[in-house]
Each structure stands twice: as C-alpha cells, then as structure tokens.
C-alpha cells in the first residue's frame, strides 16, 4: 500500500465565534430505545436525518449506539470527556462514501451503562463491548476509528482480535508497545507524581473537580485545542495548565454549539465518575497486559495528530518510529495549528483522509 499520505498539513488558525456558548438550558430527555432500521431525530442526533439510535446488550452492559449509512462497517470509539456525538461529521462523510458508520457511547459515558467499579474499564472490558456489539449486529468484522481513550481501546482491540478488526484509523493517541515499566511508575521514580495529569484524573476527588459540566466541558475543549495560547495551553506535566480550567470566553467556531450543549447536558446528568474510571483502570491494566508485551499491530493503520496537542509531550513520535509497533502503518499526518480535538478542529482533513483510508482497506 502507498504511504504518500504522510506529511504535515497546515490548518488556518480558527476564529472565535461571536455566538457565546449558552451553558444553561434544559437537560436532554431519556434516551430512546429504537429498533434498528427506524429513523430517528432525537436529542442525541441533533436532528440529523438518516441517523438511527438503539441500545444493545453486550458484555454485561447496555451500549447506546448511533448509526448512519449502509455498507462495510466502520466502528467509532470516542474518548474523554465525550460521547458518540463527537463523530457526527465523520459519520456523515463515511456514510456518504458508502459505509455503515456505527458509534457507541463508550461504557461510562452518555446513555450507555456506567459501572461504578474502576476495574471494569480496562481494554479487556471495552474490547469485549466492541466484539459483543459486532456480534449483536451480526457483523463479522469492522474497521476501527478512535480518538483519545477511544484510540487507546481501538489499538488494543486490534491487538487482541485481529480476526474481527481489520484496519485501524486513530487520532491523537499513538500505539506504544508495552514496555517493562508503566508510565505511572516512571513518573513516581522521576519525582513527577504531583505533576503528571493522570494521577490527578485518577483521584477520588476528580469526580467533584469535573462535576460542573457547563464549565469543565467547554474548558477542556478550549485548553486542549490549538486555539489556546501556546504558553497557557494544556500540559500533561503542569497542574497550573490543567484540562478543567474555565474557558476564557466564547469557544472557537470549530466547537459547534449543538455538540457542546449535548455533551454538557449528558455529563451534567450522569456525572464524570464513569468516564474518569478509564484513568483509574490504566495502571492496573499495565500489569494485566503482560501477555501482549512485544506484540505489534499488523493491520493496515493510519494516524493523525495535532502539532499543538499537549500529548505530544508524552509521545514525541514520528510516523517512522510508530512503525516499530505498527509495521503496517500506511502513513500519518501532523496538523499545524491543531490541538487534541482533531476531528473538530480539522474535520475536512480528517474526513478526506478517513474516506481515502477506507477505500484503500475495504472498498465499497
């Protein structure tokens, strides 16, 4: 396969919308249970036509699922703090290209089940959720798309079940093969236990720190993006530049009001305990993942990340370096003026590359 999709793309810096995000407003109603094939224009879809919503019992929980289009299956996995709504632009592009876009609210988020036990949020559970979802929909295999924690779980799903997941397209979080020492232990030994953001995210009081969704949801969207000033932008190693600070004003124009309002309402309703459990499960999973030490992802893959993403402090990788763990990496893009929210800050680039990738690995 050709690797000419690699490179750097410059995205114009976004303007600030004059429409201030209205953090107040009514909460969305309970999720609708829909038979597959029924048409829906619910609060979860923002009134987008052609969207279907339904609930699926899988792996001991209920996943709320959004779907659009017909054709080869493409399974989207979101991160923190997010819901399946984050993928609406990509789902539309994929469906228009002749694919079946399927996006669950990941366990702990949105209208899916949210177990309280943090040990139930490792890739062992989430990969089981995804396999069970494919089984329920009678889909033998799918292409995976992931962002943030969703990218982590997508990479792990490809590692564990190459028979069910035949290609991987990830945003923001690269695949890093398991080493001998966890990142948590490295931070302790280097004296950074009070600095590294994942320790704060794992603490019991993190639920309360994040609880005010009308403040924290717009805050993380702004501070983790390429729109924030470089010297104040989120840093995973500086508590003074945290993710949960209030945004200084109206969000940039790329943060669509319907999307922001949906996530604010959902997290104000559910709280953040389930979503934060992914951080609490991360260190225990390192020790559970010993059987996959040295394993590589062999499926065709593609990776996009923003040059202004704070995660690059933790993962300063090049595409060539990533190939040591993902030898079938077709290529990757680093986007100028883009931070962590790649699918929102640069949707046209992401959509174009995603459709090209799908047409390469699973033509319609």
Question: What are these regions, as identified by a protein language model?
Answer:
Residues 49-51, 60, 109-145, 149-330:
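Flexible "cap/lid" subdomain of the alpha/beta-hydrolase fold that forms the substrate-access gate
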Residues 329-364:
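Catalytic active-site module of serine/aspartate enzymes centered on a nucleophile-bearing elbow/loop
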Residues 1-16:
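N-terminal secretory signal peptides
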Residues 67-111:
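Conserved HGGG/HGGXW glycine-rich cap/lid loop of the alpha/beta-hydrolase fold
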